[in-house]
Every structure is written in C-alpha cells, then in structure tokens.
Design a protein with these regions (language model features):
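A general structural signal for well-ordered alpha-helical packing
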Residues: 92, 96, 115-122, 139-143, ...
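RNase H-like DDE/DDD metal-dependent nuclease/strand-transfer catalytic core used by mobile genetic elements
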Residues: 1-4, 10-113, 124, 218, ...
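Long, charge-rich alpha-helical interaction segments
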Residues: 111, 116-119, 123-133
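Short, acidic, Ser/Thr-enriched surface-loop or helix-capping motifs
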Residues: 9-10, 202
Length: 236
C-alpha cells in the first residue's frame, strides 16, 4: 500500500508535483511541498482541504505544516467540500487509471523507481497532453501566463535554513555530560553552554541537532549530524 500526493497549478493545470509515499504523514508533506517549490516557485496561497495536517479547530492556532508555510508567506485557502477540489481529485483518478498497469508492465514494485517514472510521466503530461478545458498542454498555458505577467509565483531562493524548515523539529535536553538522545542511544554533541538543542528529523532519514530554531537570527549552528539512517520513518 502507498499514498499519492498531488499538487496542481489552478491556472495552467500544470502538475507541479506527483509522488508516492509509504503513507500520508507530516514527513511526507515536508518532503513533497519543497520539491514543488524548488521546481516551480513559491505561490502566494495553496488550496487545501480540512485535513489535520493543514487545519486545527483551536482558534488562533496553526498546524505545524501551516506554520512552516507561513514562514514563506504562503496562505492556506480551505475547500468547503471534497467536490470543491475537483481538479486535484480528477488527477488522482488520472494516475489511478494509468499507474498500476504501467508499473505492472515495467516490472516496477518499489516506490523509488516508481517515483522516477512518475517524474517523467508528469513532465510528459504537462508538455504534450492537451487539456480539454484550456485546449492546450498545461506547460504551454504556464508559459503563456508568465509571458503575459499573470503569474504571482516567487522564485525559490534556498537559504541556509531551508533543510531545517522542512524537517520535524523538537526541543531536546542536553545532559550534563554533553549528550543528547539519538534513536536508542545517546551521542555527544559539539560543546555548548546551552541546556537544550533542536532535534531536526529530515525526510531522507538523517537527523540534525541545531543550537537554535529557525527564525532566531543568524545562520544555523549545527551541533551534531547523523546520516546513517537506513530509511525515513514514514509514520510521523
């Protein structure tokens, strides 16, 4: 079993992202969204549903993902009903009709090779398949909008904080011996006067300990970096 995440530009119908994950979780979104931003730019707003990843019933509060997007000045607009997200739902059906038979024919059984092919299929769809509503390939509509100055996308400029903003962060205590918890062990980090560190879990399975959280001023100070994880924990 796997979950597919899709992102589409509402104006041009360009598929800006399509990717399979072992399951739908926060870490999957933190991997998926920046991929699309890097390829196509950062939008002013995203049209989403009332999933708990995007919406909280506590007035004045933001979800972790919404807080991350706010850092980039991306607002969230909420679809009132599932039918209101018809464009993206049709693309879910589009892939459900094509992908299983394609993977079966190509002998693809793992997510990594499936995602490699998805990138190629998505690009082919954007550039060569005429959309029945706009009567042109999505990529052509995209380029036309850019030429006519109808795009509000902002260039994606990766600053040093980029990989840490798109991680799951938590504060951990630094013990008197200068160690922090790492999986089922403890590791010694770069000596610091601080009594706590920021634990960052990345989508590639790696873990970073920072001295300060994003937005604290100055560049990130890395206290420890762990890159030996075999696979990302797709359950957070």
């Amino acid at each position: 079993m796997s979950s597919m995440l899709n992102m589409i530009d509402d104006c041009s119908r360009v598929l800006t992202g399509t990717r399979l994950y072992p399951r739908e979780c926060l870490l999957a979104y933190l991997d998926f969204i920046p991929r699309a931003f890097e390829l196509y730019g950062i939008p002013l707003a995203m049209y989403v549903d009332y999933h708990s990843f995007f919406f909280t019933h506590i007035p004045g509060n933001l979800t972790y993902l919404a807080e991350t997007l706010r850092y980039f000045d991306v607002s969230l607009l909420y679809a009132p009903t599932p039918q209101a997200k018809g464009k993206i739902e049709r693309h879910h059906g589009f892939w459900q009709n094509r992908l299983p038979s394609f993977c079966l024919a190509e002998g693809i059984r793992e997510l990594d090779p499936a995602n490699e092919q998805l990138d190629l299929l998505r690009e082919h769809h954007n550039r060569h398949e005429t959309h029945r509503e706009i009567r042109m390939p999505p990529q052509e509509a995209w380029e036309q909008a850019l030429k006519e100055g109808r795009s509000t996308l902002r260039p994606c400029q990766r600053d040093p904080w980029w990989p840490y903003l798109w991680s799951i962060r938590s504060q951990v205590r630094i013990d008197a011996d200068g160690t922090v918890p790492l999986e089922k062990q403890r590791v010694k980090i770069t000596p610091t006067y601080r009594r706590s560190a920021i634990h960052c879990r990345h989508a590639d399975g790696s873990i970073t300990y920072l001295a300060e959280p994003p937005g604290s001023g100055g560049p990130p100070i890395i206290l420890y970096r762990y890159e030996n994880a075999t696979s990302p924990p797709w359950n957070v």
